[in-house]
Amino acid sequence: MKLFKNLTVQVITAVIIGVIVGLVWPDVGKEMKPLGDTFINAVKMVIAPIIFFTIVLGIAKMGDMKKVGKVGGKAFIYFEVVTTLALIIGLFVVNIMKPGAGLDYSKLEKGDVSQYTQNGGQGIDWIEFITHIVPSNMVDAFAKGDILQVLFFSILFGVGLAALGEKGKSVIDFFDKVSHVFFKIIGYIMRAAPIGAFGAMAYTIGHFGLDSIKPLASLMMSVYITMFLFVFVALNIICKLYGFSLWNYLRFIKDELLIVLGTSSSESVLPRMMDKMERYGCSKSVVGLVIPTGYSFNLDGTSIYLSMATVFLAQVFGVDLSIGQQITIILVLMLTSKGAAGVTGSGFIVLASTLSALQVIPLEGLALLLGVDRFMSEGRAIVNLIGNGIATIIVAKSENEFDEAKSIEAVEGMKKMKTAV
């Protein structure tokens, strides 16, 4: 019985039961959607305040504004380099495996993507994107849970609080206590993670069914193989270069990975990841700056999917993309994959923008992806989560803001828990 008190076991069991319910009783599975939605909403309820307090405390305690700029600069350079690497790996594998070759477009099931292509074909409005980052109303930014707007306000508030020096110490102490309250709340919410994972998985299988993925199984297989290679080859090499174990890190965040697998949302574990990265040895200031920005700008899994989906559609329509056109895909996605972050249906908006820039692949090809997109979202979310944690560790290490002793203690503690179970 002690085994079933472990969150990992609970989530795995919930996901398996969800799959069974969705397959055997699809109508019942469809009715389970509110369970997953309610859990994700509960997490989203505390995301904005947790981001605010973590960033403000991190900047205020760091004090040195030059260091804040340095951490932010290193994070953005890392994000751009690694997401570009993900795009290149995606293109390389899709050109070798050719999952779209031989598929007959006219015989494949299609969905309605008009809501994504109406504006997507015109590309991302960069002026609107930049102006949107600055909130016109602070309360509205928190109410909507807009991560970029909350991030912008939090950085300004943290800089202002740090500038007060000793006068701001009482505010820092108060915020520190309040932040602990919010992390306590997220701890309570996470006890319901198995229920949320069950509901989300039962709905996914019940609503979409496994039949919808059969025609495009080659694309799914190619994407998942690429994600596996990216994590266990590319990211593993990066981890070794910076002197830490990918395996220990993955074992440390296994609960979060399973929750993301069940809910298909990396946002569902954002607060827990911030707490976990601190416990793993990263300083609060680095965690506060890197994790939230990574959720918008360091989307490794999404980058892999977008590059592969673009070439896949070209293969379906028999379009032979030149090296120059594939370089254009990388350049366009380097920008648009960040520009549409956090927007509902952003994957389709970005794909529409990319196809529009190339002007050789019909936009209606996006309709092919609707049936399998939901089954690839788990992979995207998991790789995004893994990538953001690794980015945080690397930036912390490069700034001497990583506590090796704390990291060893966290890993040893995890091993003791495993032995106890």
UniProtKB/Swiss-Prot annotation:
GO biological process: L-aspartate transmembrane transport
Organism: Bacillus subtilis (strain 168)
MF-aspect GO terms: fumarate transmembrane transporter activity; malate:proton symporter activity; succinate transmembrane transporter activity
Membrane topology: Multi-pass membrane protein
Keywords annotated in UniProt: Cell membrane, Membrane, Symport, Transmembrane, Transmembrane helix, Transport
InterPro entries associated with the record: C4_dicarb_transport, Na-dicarboxylate_symporter, Na-dicarboxylate_symporter_CS, Na:dicarbo_symporter_sf
A GO CC term attached to the entry: plasma membrane
Subcellular locations according to the entry: Cell membrane
Gene this chain is encoded by: dctA
Family: Belongs to the dicarboxylate/amino acid:cation symporter (DAACS) (TC 2.A.23) family.
Name of the featured protein: C4-dicarboxylate transport protein
Superkingdom as given in the UniProt entry: Bacteria
